[in-house]
C-alpha cells in the first residue's frame, strides 16, 4: 500500500458555470449535490436539466462526465461520492460537484469506498472551518491523502467487495 495525494493520480476539475435561468424542465440531466444525496438515500428530488445545445457547447469547452468518473459533493454534505453509471449526456453544477476523471491508476468503486470511509469523514472535518458553510474545493480534493493498494487488481477487489457489502446491508434494512 502507498499514500498518495488524489491530485497525483488523476485529473480533478469542475464543470463550466450554468446560470439558473439556463435550467430547463427537460433535456440533459444537470446534477447538483442534492441529486447525489438523493441517489445515495434512494429518494427523489426536483430534477434540473439543460438544453442539448447548451450541453454541446459546454462539453466542447470543458468536457462532460463519462462512465466510471466519480463526482464528489463540494457543497452541502461535502465529500459524498457518486459514480457516473453510463455515458448518457450529463452535466454538473460547477463547484457544487467536483469531477474526478477515471483513469487506469484508480478504481472508481475503491475511490467511492474511500469517500464513504470514517477515515475520509474525519479528514473532511479536520479541513472544514467551524462556523462557516462547509465547502470541499478542487484544491482540497487534489491535496486529499489516499492510502491505497499499488495494484489496480487489488483496488478492484476491495471496491467490489465493499460495494457488495453495502448492497447486502441496504437489502436487509
Descriptions of predicted regions:
Residues 19, 42-45, 171-173:
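Short, tandemly repeated low-complexity microdomains enriched for cysteine and small residues
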Residues 39-43, 135-137:
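Short acidic/His/Gly/Ser-rich catalytic and metal-binding motifs that mark active-site loops
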Residues 23-24:
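Short, glycine-/polar-rich solvent-exposed loops and beta-turns at beta-strand/coil boundaries
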Residues 1-2, 140, 144, 151-173:
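Amphipathic alpha-helical segments with low aromatic content
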Residues 74, 90-98, 129-154:
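A short glycine-rich beta-alpha junction/loop motif
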Residues 32-34, 44, 49-120:
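A short beta-sheet element
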Residues 1-15:
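Non-catalytic DNA-recognition/assembly elements of restriction-modification systems
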Amino acid at each position: 500500500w502507498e499514500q498518495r495525494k488524489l491530485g497525483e493520480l488523476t485529473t480533478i476539475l469542475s464543470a463550466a458555470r450554468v446560470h439558473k435561468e439556463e435550467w430547463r424542465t427537460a433535456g440533459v440531466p444537470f446534477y447538483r449535490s442534492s441529486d447525489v444525496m438523493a441517489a445515495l438515500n434512494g429518494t427523489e428530488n426536483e430534477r434540473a436539466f439543460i438544453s442539448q445545445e447548451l450541453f454541446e457547447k459546454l462539453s466542447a469547452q470543458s468536457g462532460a462526465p463519462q462512465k466510471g468518473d466519480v463526482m464528489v459533493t463540494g457543497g452541502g454534505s461535502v465529500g459524498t461520492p457518486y459514480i457516473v453509471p453510463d455515458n448518457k449526456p450529463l452535466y454538473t453544477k460547477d463547484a457544487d460537484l467536483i469531477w474526478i476523471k477515471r483513469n487506469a491508476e484508480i478504481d472508481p468503486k475503491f475511490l467511492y469506498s474511500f469517500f464513504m470511509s470514517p477515515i475520509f469523514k474525519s479528514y473532511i472535518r479536520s479541513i472544514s472551518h467551524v462556523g462557516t458553510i462547509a465547502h470541499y474545493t478542487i484544491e482540497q480534493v487534489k491535496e486529499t491523502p489516499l492510502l491505497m493498494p499499488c495494484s489496480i487488481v487489488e483496488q478492484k477487489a476491495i471496491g467490489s467487495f465493499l460495494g457488495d457489502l453495502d448492497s447486502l446491508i441496504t437489502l436487509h434494512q
